[in-house]
UniProtKB/Swiss-Prot annotation:
Protein name per Swiss-Prot or TrEMBL: Protein YncO
Gene Ontology cellular-component annotations: plasma membrane
Induction, per UniProt: Expressed approximately equally in exponential and stationary phases (at protein level).
Compartment(s): Cell inner membrane
Pfam families given in the database record: YncO (PF23695)
Membrane protein topology class: Single-pass membrane protein
Keywords assigned: Cell inner membrane, Cell membrane, Membrane, Transmembrane, Transmembrane helix
Residue spans crossing the bilayer: 18-38
Length: 61
């Protein structure tokens, strides 16, 4: 999120076309979106493994 604010605050050194900015922002949001989904899926996966492991241990004990 920091990068987005930095890019918003930074003025363009050259007159940028609106299309370029549009594509750039879409790309930026897509990357962030994918990263958040990836992180949340990793957390879910981790918690499932942990849960299964606990269950497995309790069965053996």
């Amino acid at each position: 999120m920091i990068y987005i604010t930095i890019f918003m605050i930074l003025p363009c050194p050259v007159p940028c076309s609106h299309v370029f900015l549009y594509v750039f922002y879409i790309f930026l949001f897509l990357v962030l979106f994918i990263m958040t989904i990836y992180q949340s899926s990793q957390k879910l996966h981790f918690s499932n493994c942990y849960h299964n492991n606990q269950h497995h241990n309790s069965l053996h004990n």
